[in-house]
């Protein structure tokens, strides 16, 4: 069973981050709108909700500060 737990959109750029449950794992997905209307997705799976929430929270902090590049944000999921 898969479902979205939370999704947050950056008010400045339209970028989004979602926290999803996929079976017994949790996934953080970073979504970047491209100029041609398509989207670039980067995601990472986590074994625990605590680990996934930690990364999800970091994205929200990055969105709030507005100081970090797309590359910096993608690096959170490496």
What are the functions of these language-model segments?
Residues 16, 43-45:
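Well-ordered beta-strand positions in beta-sheet-rich domains
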Residues 1-31, 69-70:
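Short N-terminal "domain-start" leader segments
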Residues 3, 38-40:
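Tryptophan-centered short beta-strand motifs
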Residues 10-11, 30-34, 45, 75:
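Secondary-structure transition/turn motif
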Residues 34-38, 45-67:
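A short, charged, amphipathic alpha-helix used as a generic interaction element across diverse proteins
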Residues 7, 21-24, 36, 51, ...:
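Generic detector of low-complexity/intrinsically disordered segments
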Residues 62-78:
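Short glycine-rich, low-complexity/disordered patches
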């Amino acid at each position: 069973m898969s479902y979205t737990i939370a999704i947050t959109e950056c008010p400045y750029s339209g970028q989004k981050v979602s926290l999803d449950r996929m079976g017994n794992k949790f996934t953080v997905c970073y979504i970047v709108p491209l100029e041609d209307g398509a989207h670039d997705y980067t995601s990472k799976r986590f074994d625990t909700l605590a680990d996934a929430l930690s990364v999800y929270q970091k994205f929200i902090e990055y969105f709030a500060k507005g100081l970090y590049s797309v590359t910096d944000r993608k690096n959170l999921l490496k």
